[in-house]
Amino acid sequence: MSKFLQQKPIILASSSTIRHKLMKSLGLDFLVVPSNCNEEEIKTRHNSDELVELGITLAKIKALDVSQHYPEHYIIAADQLCVADKRVFNKPLNHQTAVSHLRELSGKEHQQIACLCIVKESKILWQYHETATLTLHHLSEKTIEAYLQAEKPYQSCGAYQYEGLGKWLFKEVQGSEDTILGLPLMPLVNALVNLKVVGI
């Protein structure tokens, strides 16, 4: 870390390489300690139509899970939901599911909801969400197949990697790129300063 920033101990409770890169872009020193919580079980138990509430709940559970093992650290956790017509599109994990997701999203508007929280000593200090709205071009079967073979975005909600070739799939985007990638940076920076986790 440069002498420009003074900071307290921070942990990113995420295994996402994109979130790791975004955090690194801020010049922070931090540990990466992914949570062991069962996200699918939490999603199954969630019986509300409030999808933002689900995303915030997942972020909080991840942060609290890690915080109990690292009470001296400020824990940053996040969750990302890809939503269209009140349906959540989880990570496809395989080629055929990715094809199905892109077929369903083709030509339509959907949202990427990024949810964040900061926890210290098992206390929730800050929570936040931000939504980006994206519209895909009408995608041919040939385009879907060629894109998936090129990028294999099977670990990405929505079956695309917006940080890479995925940008070519869209005709309209409203919202910041870091929100689409799952870690809205300016709100996080302001929260870290306001909580005196980081000083300049």
Curated annotation (Swiss-Prot):
Task: Please give the Gene Ontology molecular function terms for this protein.
Answer: nucleoside triphosphate diphosphatase activity
Q: Which subcellular locations apply to this protein?
A: Cytoplasm
Q: Which GO terms describe its biological process?
A: nucleotide metabolic process
Look up the record and name the cofactor or cofactors this protein needs. Answer: a divalent metal cation
Which organism is the protein's source? Legionella pneumophila (strain Paris)
Q: What family does the entry list?
A: Belongs to the Maf family.
Keywords in alphabetical order: Cytoplasm, Hydrolase, Nucleotide metabolism
CDD domains (alphabetical) = Maf
Q: What NCBIfam families does the record point to? A: maf
Q: What class of enzyme is it?
A: hydrolase
GO CC annotations on file: cytoplasm
Kindly give the Pfam families that the UniProt entry links to this protein.
Answer: Maf (PF02545)
Q: Catalytic residues?
A: D79 (proton acceptor)
Which InterPro entries does the record associate with it?
Answer: ITPase-like_fam, Maf-like
Q: What does this protein do?
A: Nucleoside triphosphate pyrophosphatase. May have a dual role in cell division arrest and in preventing the incorporation of modified nucleotides into cellular nucleic acids.
Per its record, how is this protein called by name?
Nucleoside triphosphate pyrophosphatase
So what does this thing catalyse? a ribonucleoside 5'-triphosphate + H2O = a ribonucleoside 5'-phosphate + diphosphate + H(+); a 2'-deoxyribonucleoside 5'-triphosphate + H2O = a 2'-deoxyribonucleoside 5'-phosphate + diphosphate + H(+)
Superkingdom is Bacteria
EC number(s) stated in the UniProt entry for this protein: 3.6.1.9
